[in-house]
């Protein structure tokens, strides 16, 4: 009888034991497979490593490791030696070879086809085929692990409000030393919300953006019904209205398109565009208006080239041209600015035609999370000689009409954005959004910062001080989390020490770049069967794509062709900045937020 009781107790203990894979024993992208209740096996297939935990490098891997520089070394080389890079940029075969390396080395870090999602931490047909999920770069922490980060850290994560108040919320605006401006900030927000579309009913693990990439649904609408309501059905164009001699989006009343506006907004100020949340701030509506004008302009060009084409073909071809323009602007202007490289990035799909590359993409929830760059936002917005706080700015399309696009572009080009890394720079006005980012990450059971660093070929941090580059915030984080291996991803990205004179820290760049470049170059228009003049209506349409830039987009669609870029016109304005947020000790209670964003804006 006693023997049976002991056997039963042993069985119960074994059944309740922690999943042996909770400690993430398999290294170098080896996959952990539990064997019974207390053992595991690492699958090291095609990792370049072998051994019980995939830690012993194969011969070729050893050579690669000896020759491969660290990410920070590569970044240093690319952001220094300007004279050398000027020569490289003017030698086509050298520039092409380096660009091929940049694209392949980054994009090969992204699993394609996708592997996991929030509910499947192992390979499954559901994780592959169900497009309503965001994919995952790393599987979620198993439900039966002893701590939220597996086996490291405390039994419970710290209160999200405490994390916000101690290390994330702004005491004083910290400008970006790279000179990033508000034209960039609103472009980022506008561009990414064609594929970051979390399903508000089902939760943060799900998306309504089933195209999972650059489809310009934020211009044309997510569904065919919405698209049809926004279309003019004449000459391929989108509906519009003329105000003071300039083209603006049509109204909700005219289109019967659902948009998110508070009830007090008058009908004439309720503009209707592809993304239902873009009425939130005039900066988003500015870009929505610019792209509306560009679509209708391209339709006019194609109509002149092809008078025989019907409305549908003019519309569809114009959409492909705008997709091409978008990708070129993102790579050659947007990513170029973010990188800080002296090497000149190049959008040329032909560079990958002889490489192993899959023309498909799936948006990862980690990519969505890391793109919450709310520190970019200033405390106030200056248009010409008028200053608006958040409360005056939100849902106020009348500002856009009153000032006009020219003043908006000129003003946002000159207004500096905030630094994203380094901590304590999230505006109080959007603290609810930052809090939601933390809580959504926990709901989706993200692994720790260090696990993501290893996944993207970076060395794990050994201390909080190494993460932040200072002592005060590091001590606060250690008190909150207890172990650097239990540090959460999202807060870590915002408190990580920035690279020298840069907007981001190492992890943000090394994680974000692979997702970004794979998503851009994995677009169908970049594939061999699409990338040819006939796809874009002939040489004229192909030329529009191949000559696109943020400056040409503005020149073609904004009166007076104001000079613009994604950085301040005078780089000296960004030089005198605080390097570390720990220097600011002002109390949060001394500052009062203007407004808390609500509803669908948690993703903005």
Swiss-Prot record:
Superkingdom per UniProt: Eukaryota
Catalytic reaction equation(s): (5Z,8Z,11Z,14Z)-eicosatetraenoate + AH2 + 2 O2 = prostaglandin H2 + A + H2O; (5Z,8Z,11Z,14Z)-eicosatetraenoate + 2 O2 = prostaglandin G2; prostaglandin G2 + AH2 = prostaglandin H2 + A + H2O; (5Z,8Z,11Z,14Z,17Z)-eicosapentaenoate + 2 O2 = prostaglandin G3
Cofactor(s) demanded: heme b
Signal sequence coordinates: 1-17
Gene Ontology terms: biological process: cyclooxygenase pathway; prostaglandin biosynthetic process; regulation of blood pressure; regulation of neuroinflammatory response; response to oxidative stress
Keywords for this protein: Dioxygenase, Disulfide bond, Endoplasmic reticulum, Fatty acid biosynthesis, Fatty acid metabolism, Glycoprotein, Heme, Iron, Lipid biosynthesis, Lipid metabolism, Membrane, Metal-binding, Microsome, Nucleus, Oxidoreductase, Peroxidase, Prostaglandin biosynthesis, Prostaglandin metabolism, S-nitrosylation, Signal
UniProt: substrate binding residues: 106, 341
Pfam families according to UniProt: An_peroxidase (PF03098), EGF (PF00008)
PANTHER family found in the cross-reference section: PROSTAGLANDIN G/H SYNTHASE, PROSTAGLANDIN G_H SYNTHASE 2
Note: The conversion of arachidonate to prostaglandin H2 is a 2 step reaction: a cyclooxygenase (COX) reaction which converts arachidonate to prostaglandin G2 (PGG2) and a peroxidase reaction in which PGG2 is reduced to prostaglandin H2 (PGH2). The cyclooxygenase reaction occurs in a hydrophobic channel in the core of the enzyme. The peroxidase reaction occurs at a heme-containing active site located near the protein surface. The nonsteroidal anti-inflammatory drugs (NSAIDs) binding site corresponds to the cyclooxygenase active site. Conversion of arachidonate to prostaglandin H2 is mediated by 2 different isozymes: the constitutive PTGS1 and the inducible PTGS2. PTGS1 is expressed constitutively and generally produces prostanoids acutely in response to hormonal stimuli to fine-tune physiological processes requiring instantaneous, continuous regulation (e.g. hemostasis). PTGS2 is inducible and typically produces prostanoids that mediate responses to physiological stresses such as infection and inflammation.
Protein function: Dual cyclooxygenase and peroxidase in the biosynthesis pathway of prostanoids, a class of C20 oxylipins mainly derived from arachidonate ((5Z,8Z,11Z,14Z)-eicosatetraenoate, AA, C20:4(n-6)), with a particular role in the inflammatory response. The cyclooxygenase activity oxygenates AA to the hydroperoxy endoperoxide prostaglandin G2 (PGG2), and the peroxidase activity reduces PGG2 to the hydroxy endoperoxide prostaglandin H2 (PGH2), the precursor of all 2-series prostaglandins and thromboxanes.
Name of the protein in its database record: Prostaglandin G/H synthase 2
The species this protein was found in: Cavia porcellus (Guinea pig)
Gene name tied to this protein: PTGS2
């Amino acid at each position: 009888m006693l023997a049976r009781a002991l056997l039963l107790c042993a069985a119960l203990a074994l059944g309740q034991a922690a999943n042996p894979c909770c400690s993430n024993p398999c290294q170098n992208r080896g996959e952990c497979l539990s064997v019974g209740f207390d053992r595991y096996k690492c699958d090291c297939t095609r990792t370049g490593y072998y051994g019980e935990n995939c830690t012993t490098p194969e011969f070729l891997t050893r050579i690669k490791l000896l020759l491969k520089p660290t990410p920070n070394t590569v970044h240093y080389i690319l952001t220094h030696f300007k004279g050398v890079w000027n020569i490289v940029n003017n030698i086509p075969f050298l520039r092409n070879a380096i660009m091929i390396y940049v694209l392949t080395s980054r994009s090969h870090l992204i699993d394609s086809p996708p592997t996991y999602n929030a509910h499947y931490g192992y390979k499954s047909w559901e994780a592959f085929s169900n497009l309503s999920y965001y994919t995952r770069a790393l599987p979620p922490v198993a439900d039966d692990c002893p701590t939220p980060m597996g086996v490291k850290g405390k039994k419970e994560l710290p209160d999200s409000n405490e994390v916000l108040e101690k290390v994330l919320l702004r005491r004083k605006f910290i400008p970006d030393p790279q000179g990033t401006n508000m034209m960039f900030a609103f472009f980022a927000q506008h561009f990414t919300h064609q594929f970051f579309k979390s399903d508000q009913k089902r939760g943060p693990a799900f998306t309504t953006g089933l195209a999972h990439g650059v489809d310009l649904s934020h211009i044309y609408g997510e569904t065919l019904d919405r698209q049809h309501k926004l279309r003019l059905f004449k000459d391929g164009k989108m509906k519009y209205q003329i105000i003071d001699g300039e083209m603006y989006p049509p109204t909700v009343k005219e289109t019967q398109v659902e948009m998110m506006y508070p009830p007090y907004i008058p009908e004439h100020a309720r503009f209707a565009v592809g993304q239902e949340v873009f009425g939130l701030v005039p900066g988003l509506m500015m870009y929505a208006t610019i792209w509306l004008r560009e679509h209708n302009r391209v339709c006019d060009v194609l109509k002149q080239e092809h008078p025989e084409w019907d409305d549908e073909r003019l519309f569809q071809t114009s959409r492909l041209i705008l997709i091409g323009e978008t990708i070129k602007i993102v790579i050659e202007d947007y990513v170029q600015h973010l990188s800080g490289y002296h090497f000149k990035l190049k959008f040329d799909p032909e560079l990958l035609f002889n490489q192993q590359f899959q023309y498909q993409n799936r948006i990862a929830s980690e990519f969505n999370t890391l793109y919450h760059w709310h520190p970019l936002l200033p405390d106030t917005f200056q248009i010409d000689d008028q200053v608006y706080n958040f409360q005056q700015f939100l849902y106020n399309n009348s500002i856009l009409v009153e000032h006009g696009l020219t003043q908006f572009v000129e003003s946002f080009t000159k207004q500096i954005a905030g630094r994203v890394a380094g901590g304590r720079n999230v505006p109080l006005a959007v603290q609810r959004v930052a809090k939601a980012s933390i809580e959504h990450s926990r709901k989706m059971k993200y692994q720790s910062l260090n696990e993501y660093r290893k996944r993207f070929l970076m060395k794990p941090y050994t201390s909080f001080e190494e993460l932040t580059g200072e002592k005060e915030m590091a001590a606060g984080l250690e008190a909150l989390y207890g172990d650097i291996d239990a540090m959460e991803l999202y807060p870590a990205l915002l408190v990580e020490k920035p690279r020298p004179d840069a907007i981001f820290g190492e992890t943000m760049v090394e994680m974000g770049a692979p997702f970004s470049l794979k998503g851009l170059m994995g677009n169908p228009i970049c594939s061999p069967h699409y990338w040819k003049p006939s796809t874009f209506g002939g040489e004229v349409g192909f030329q529009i794509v191949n000559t696109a830039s943020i400056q040409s987009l503005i020149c073609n669609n904004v009166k007076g062709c104001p000079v613009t870029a994604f950085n301040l016109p005078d780089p000296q304005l960004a030089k005198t900045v605080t390097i570390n947020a720990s220097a600011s000790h002002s109390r949060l209670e001394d500052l009062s937020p203007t407004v808390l964003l609500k509803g669908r804006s948690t993703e903005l």
